[in-house]
Amino acid sequence: MPVSILVLYDRKNSAIESLARAAASGVELSGADVTLKRTTEAITADLLAADGLLLGSPNWSGITGSLKSWLDDQGDLWEDGSLAGKPAAAFTSGSGQHSGLEMTLLQMIHWMLACGMVVVGLPWGERMRVAGSYYGATAVGDMTTEDMAQARELGARLASIATKLTRT
């Protein structure tokens, strides 16, 4: 049975949605099942049912308030350890290269670590000269083919690690 990955993101009709769809295609290409949901559609059961999580937010001086609220609502999962051991990765978009993209990724990663999740990033590659970060997938301004490629790579990498973790 293939692993299932939840791609959860905040905001509709933005670069973040394009990154979410690209990451989801990477999950699918790896043979895993994927569920793509905005925070307005997702419930706790979606998170619990998934073998891994890809979490995304546009950079608004950090994650959006609505994503922060959604994550705060999952406090019981932090307390009971329900997410411990699940792999997770992050993605973000912003208007400028130095607008705080890595801080936004780190905010999401902080929540993942607090929940005991296994954080998955992107290893160095030539593509990283123009797109992405060790901390996760990124897009700056208009979406590029490199942005889409590194989001797909992150999705496939997360699915691969989720498969390895669920088979051990």
What are the language-model segments listed below?
Residues 1-82, 128-130, 135, 139-168:
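N-terminal beta1-alpha1-beta2 submodule of the flavodoxin-like/Rossmannoid cofactor-binding fold
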Residues 3, 84-87, 120:
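Residue-level recognition of the N-termini of beta-strands and the immediately preceding loop/turn
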Residues 7, 16, 86-90, 112:
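Long hydrophobic alpha-helices with heptad-repeat/coiled-coil character
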Residues 58, 64-65, 87, 91-95:
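Short strand-turn motif at the edge of the Rossmann-like AdoMet-binding core
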